[in-house]
């Protein structure tokens, strides 16, 4: 259940989530209809075993999950059938259908195929820190994160969440760290980075499994390249890649964090899940607060 990526948003800590359990059922995921392309809504964080539980809260952490069902209609299949239909009409009527007629034919084909299309299920998990006013979405896609915000907005009626905004350029901070400026306490460099020439269409350099402080990196910095992605390690607990878009990718929970689970005395699957949720939420909070200070992240009003 550990998150692998984090797209973060901020929201005012004054928001009231006390009625969340009564607000979610009306916006629960419904099966995609025969003539629908997709469906979105909330599902249980615990999966099929507890379908009626649409949220999970431990102290100031709230776990929500947005589920999706999407019809799979490969474009190649639709286009192949469309060309066959167009050929039939051309042979029968002696003329090739124009643009508008082709569009109507394509719409009719999709309408005909939808009830028989396969359905792909998906889920996107999110943790809301009600004390510090941020939401961490388990995705590296901004669009996926915005979709989760939209679903929460639909449930609450209003949810003024905004993407993270840094008061200083993240690229400048990341470049400074790799150039030798002191990192925040507990943070150290990993072995991966991406550097770009700031001019449009400039060169891009990607380094992996490499010492990030050395002559080779220095030459790129001297040439004016700036760091756009940087691998970092937080104590012995987390490793991740931070981008200048403020998205956290390749998040991994290390032994320093996982060892805490081995000392848990709780038994049972639900107790183990709660222990993992508590650990993950606390580590993400620690990381967020560190980055909030280092990058001067704006608060939500």
UniProtKB/Swiss-Prot annotation:
<dbReference type="GO" id="GO:0000018">
    <property type="term" value="P:regulation of DNA recombination"/>
</dbReference>
<comment type="similarity">
    <text>Belongs to the RdgC family.</text>
</comment>
<dbReference type="GO" id="GO:0003690">
    <property type="term" value="F:double-stranded DNA binding"/>
</dbReference>
<dbReference type="InterPro" id="IPR007476">
    <property type="entry name" value="RdgC"/>
</dbReference>
<keyword id="KW-0233">DNA recombination</keyword>
<comment type="function">
    <text>May be involved in recombination.</text>
</comment>
<protein>
    <recommendedName>
        <fullName>Recombination-associated protein RdgC</fullName>
    </recommendedName>
</protein>
<dbReference type="Pfam" id="PF04381">
    <property type="entry name" value="RdgC"/>
</dbReference>
<dbReference type="GO" id="GO:0005737">
    <property type="term" value="C:cytoplasm"/>
</dbReference>
<keyword id="KW-0963">Cytoplasm</keyword>
<dbReference type="GO" id="GO:0043590">
    <property type="term" value="C:bacterial nucleoid"/>
</dbReference>
<dbReference type="GO" id="GO:0006310">
    <property type="term" value="P:DNA recombination"/>
</dbReference>
């Amino acid at each position: 259940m550990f998150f692998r990526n984090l797209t973060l948003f901020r929201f005012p800590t004054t928001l009231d989530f006390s009625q969340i359990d009564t607000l979610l059922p009306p916006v629960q995921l419904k099966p995609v209809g025969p003539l629908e392309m997709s469906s979105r809504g909330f599902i249980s964080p615990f999966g099929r075993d507890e379908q009626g539980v649409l949220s999970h809260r431990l102290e100031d952490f709230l776990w929500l999950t947005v589920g999706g069902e999407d019809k799979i209609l490969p474009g190649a299949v639709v286009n192949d059938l469309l060309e066959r239909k167009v050929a039939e009409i051309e042979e029968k009527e002696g003329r090739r259908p124009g643009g508008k007629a082709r569009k109507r034919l394509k719409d009719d084909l999709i309408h005909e195929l939808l009830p028989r299309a396969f359905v792909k299920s998906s889920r996107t998990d999110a943790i809301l820190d009600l004390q510090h006013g941020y939401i961490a979405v388990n995705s590296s896609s901004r669009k996926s994160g915005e979709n989760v915000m939209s679903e929460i907005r639909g449930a609450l009626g209003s949810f003024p969440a905004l993407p993270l905004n840094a008061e200083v350029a993240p690229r400048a901070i990341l470049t400074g760290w790799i150039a030798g400026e002191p990192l925040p306490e507990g943070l150290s460099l990993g072995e991966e980075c991406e550097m770009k020439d700031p001019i449009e269409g400039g060169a891009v350099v990607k380094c992996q499994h490499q010492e990030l402080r050395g002559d080779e990196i220095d030459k790129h910095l001297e040439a004016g390249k700036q760091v756009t992605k940087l691998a970092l390690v937080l104590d012995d607990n987390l490793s991740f890649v931070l981008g200048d878009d403020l998205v956290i990718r390749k998040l991994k929970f290390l032994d320093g964090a996982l060892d805490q689970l081995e000392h848990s005395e709780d038994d049972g699957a639900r107790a183990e899940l709660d222990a993992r949720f508590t650990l993950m939420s606390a580590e993400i909070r620690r990381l967020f607060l560190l980055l909030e200070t280092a990058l001067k992240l704006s608060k939500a009003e």
